[in-house]
Design a protein with these regions (language model features):
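NTP-dependent nucleotidyl-transfer catalytic core
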Residues: 1-395
Length: 395
């Protein structure tokens, strides 16, 4: 199929035109298209096979998402939205927004926008991805009173979403201009790119298991699991392993390609998830010891306490959290929260090293530093939570 497409593209055809020609000339693709026609017509046998295979896939997805701590408010299946898309395409055809070729296929002429012709319906009447995305977008805006829709999809689909926005606008949907394609870069391993076609793709479940295993091994070597039960140790390994994976990826501007290094991500020093998690656990240890000593943090710290430059800096960093979250939202950049959280714990660790907390003789200063520690921990927990990363109460 790829060779056929390359040949047709060399003849000056657009990518969609070359793909359509290649599919028509490929026996295997012809069989697949025949099945698609039967599927859209509701053929019982084809629908039965499709449902069985989809259930296998959904079960696997659910297992992976659960392990990652990911959930969705609502899932839109293309099989439930393609009819909406076909209806809108036919409306666009009737209004002259689109045109039909001799083979019956429906296309959009986007040359005025500096693009090429885009296939919307095949000659046999079956839908394509663009048709389905038109239908899905329409349903989403109908179901929810949203101002903006963000598609989190790799940068390989930049053209697709540029076209989708234009088509929706042509069809009269004002919100078509408000579609945002959050175009993220690709993740590579030290050995090279992950490509499914070349068999170098890394299974998400295998990667998570590897990260958890590495986290457990590293934590044991550093004595961070000492005194814990087996169940507690396993839970810490899970939290640290998945936290390392998520943080290492999220700390990089998502628009850039990156190399994921499993060993580097587990390091308990530097800009890593485990370093932040360990600092949070350290603060929780301080708070537990303070509580055991009968120290109660007042709702308001008494005025008149002389603060060091380091303490004033920490207070300002904690106060900056809301602005950081706002900026991250405006820029569609979780990395802003990730790196802010790292900078905060780095400053706290320096404070922890340079100043007495529980051993401070001045009672008012001691209570202030404990309260400051508690507020740093709160912000760390909230920041990591926004990144989908758990923080352990002990380590």
């Amino acid at each position: 199929l790829a060779e056929l497409m390359a040949g047709f593209t060399a003849q000056g055809m657009s990518e969609d035109e070359a793909k359509a020609k290649a599919e028509a000339a490929s026996p295997l693709m012809q069989e697949a298209r025949e099945m698609l026609v039967k599927w859209e017509a509701g053929d019982p046998e084809v629908r039965g096979l499709w449902e069985m295979m989809n259930n296998w896939v959904y079960a696997g997805f659910d297992e992976t998402y659960k392990k990652m701590g990911v959930s969705f408010d609502k899932i839109y299946y293309e099989s439930n939205t393609y009819l909406e898309g076909k209806e809108k395409v036919m409306e666009g055809l009737e209004k002259g927004f689109f045109f039909k070729k001799e083979d019956g296929s429906v296309w959009a002429d986007l040359t005025a926008e500096g693009l090429d012709h885009k296939l919307l319906l095949r000659g046999d009447g079956t839908s394509v991805y663009m048709t389905q995305d038109i239908g899905t977008a329409k349903l989403r805006f109908a179901d929810y009173p949203i101002d903006k829709m963000i598609y989190v999809v790799g940068n390989e689909q930049n053209y697709h979403f540029q076209v989708l926005s234009i088509l929706l606008d042509k069809l009269g949907f004002e919100w078509g201009k408000s579609l945002v394609h959050f175009s993220y870069g690709m993740v590579e391993l030290p050995e090279g790119k992950m490509k499914s076609r070349e068999g170098t793709v890394v299974d998400a479940d295998d990667l998570m298991e590897e990260m958890i295993s590495t986290a457990k091994e590293t934590s044991q070597e550093l004595g961070k699991l000492d005194g814990l039960t087996q169940e507690e140790a396993d839970d810490i390994a899970r939290i640290v392993g998945l936290g390392a994976l998520k943080y290492f990826i999220l700390k990089v501007d998502a628009r850039k390609n990156m190399t994921f290094n499993p060993k580097e991500s587990i390091d308990f020093n530097g800009n890593t998830g485990p370093f932040i998690q360990y600092t949070y656990a350290r603060i929780q240890s301080v708070l537990r010891k303070a509580a055991e000593s009968g120290i109660v943090i007042p709702e308001q710290i008494p005025a008149g306490i002389e603060l060091s430059e380091k303490e004033e800096g920490l207070i300002q960093m904690v106060a900056d959290f809301a602005a950081v979250v706002k900026q991250a939202g405006e820029d569609y950049s979780p990395s802003i929260i990730a790196n802010y959280t790292y900078d905060l714990v780095k400053e706290y660790n320096q404070f922890y090293h340079d100043f007495s907390i529980l051993r401070e003789e001045n009672e008012a200063v001691k209570v202030f530093r404990i309260a400051l520690s508690a507020n740093v921990a709160k912000v760390v927990r909230l920041g990591m939570g926004l990144l989908g990363i758990e923080v352990p109460s002990r380590m």
